[in-house]
Amino acid sequence: MLPKKKLLLIDLDETLIHTEFRTKENYKELEHFVKTSKCYVKTFSFSDDNCIYFMDVFFRPYLKMFLQEISKYFDLAIFTAAMKNYADTILDYIDPNNEYFQFRLYRDACIPIQNKLYIKDLRIIKDYDPSNVILMDNSLYSFMNQPSNGMLVNSFYTNNNDIQLINAKSFLIDHIYPCEDVRKECEKWYHFSKLFYKGTSKEKEETN
């Protein structure tokens, strides 16, 4: 029997955090920036293909509050188009004791399309009914296969005054948590199905 509690899938980059990779060219500029940014958390390192990368990570304002509060109402999981070793470096810091996220999905669970964009097909989720699954992401393309399950947020790029997670928390608790079917509620607010349908129809007309 499928669980009744709703599942909130959350994107990582530009939804919860922003990352700047350090290079010889931008090192001094980033050093100055991290000293003045309230969102800066830590400089992480991870290895990939025998190379070591250093990255400055910025948390979206109210990140901890958002996870603490929203986890009382939803099951949470990460669905990111990032590579596993990169994502886990940051997620292990955000959630070291696995308090918040039930599981993590990475790039290998996504469908690549053009220009480094990815679709996040929710058919990969087997333990929840589609009416109880919502994907919170800053990329509209992520919702392409199930637009009615999408919740779009603005991209985060180190803005100290960002309040998107406060707004997201209110929307999720007030509108998504009590609803019978997240798809009907999301369509009422976002109309993504109509948007994608129009885009598909236009492409067909242009190719005929």
What are these regions (language model features)?
Residues K24-E25:
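A short acidic/small-residue loop/turn micro-motif
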Residues E29-Y53:
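Conserved phosphoryl-transfer catalytic core
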Residues L9-D11, I78, L135:
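Short hydrophobic beta-strand that contains or immediately precedes a catalytic carboxylate
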Residues S47-A77, P112, K116, L122-R123:
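Short, acidic loop-to-helix structural element flanking the phosphoryl-transfer center
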Residues T15, F79-M83:
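Ser/Thr-glycine-rich phosphate-binding loops at phosphate-binding pockets of nucleotides
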Residues M1-L8, L122-I125:
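Short amphipathic alpha-helices and their capping/turn segments at secondary-structure boundaries
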Residues K4-F21:
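Asp-based phosphoryl-transfer active-site loop
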Residues K72, M83-N208:
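C-terminal cap/substrate-recognition subdomain and adjoining C-terminal extension
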